[in-house]
Amino acid sequence: MLPFFDLGFIKIPSYSLMLVLGVIAYVINLLVVLKKEGKEPPVINKALTVSLFAFAVMGITAFIFDSIFHSIEVGYLVFGGITWAGGVVGSFPAFVILTHYFIKEERGSEIEFFSLVVPGIVLGHAFGRIGCFLGGCCFGGVTESCLGVVFPTGSPAAQTYPNTITGEGSFPVLPTQLFEAGFELLLYLFMIIFRKKFKYNNAEIYLISYGIFRFILEFLRGDSRGATCFFISPSQFLSLILIITGVLIILFKKRLVFTSLYDKLSLWREQVKTGVYDAPQSVESKNAEIYKEIELLHGLYQKGILTEEEYQSKKAELLNKI
């Protein structure tokens, strides 16, 4: 534990420093990856703006979920603290929705676009967990193994598990913060090494793998994290949401669930390719745009994305608008 970096003339909170480094790591990763993907500067700038708002949503939902779980635990309303999993639950849909409305060049490919920036999120979170270790929060339960770490007197771990034998510091506890940081670094390396193969699948890979890891890690945690109305911990509850979301994305990409939305996204992707999203929206051009959509639907039918019955049905709906 090292709460502050003492430079003599100034003391820098280690947790805050790690958070800043995590954000910097995310931004650098975003700039490098999107440039490699050939994204134009306007798209990259919009991605940074979307990220800013998504981070704001992350902070809000992380705070709200943590407050809810601690309120359930004590039986009355309390505020304070954050939970990463709760932040992801809020920021992922926020990023996707904001991408749809503010980055029209990626319309129809919102999840794939999010996948491109996921490695930066993973790396940034690794820095954050190192900050947790230095700050003394998010610690594990008491252990007699060689992995145990003794936190100093006054630390959260020492307050929870005071060493009644020596009277100083905490009993040895598992450094679950470092376990999670190690997992994040390994996951980041995986995404970098196999970037070409999985770069558009990072969203579901992250949601499922992190959800499973965090669910298991919760059995080793020893700090207070609130409570749920179920038999699992708050983070295990949120982890299940992440896992289910990741599985749904896989099924969605195979067009096994939310087929209407899948067809809309496919149509939007075709529109982006042909530049239809920039088409005038005047009354005079409405019919021409409808015929253009019919052409795009026909293209989806020829590619096997739509069945003949689906194509004819959607075509009839569009023709009725003329």
Describe the residue ranges of each PLM region.
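Hydrophobic, membrane-interfacing alpha helices
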Residues: 1-286
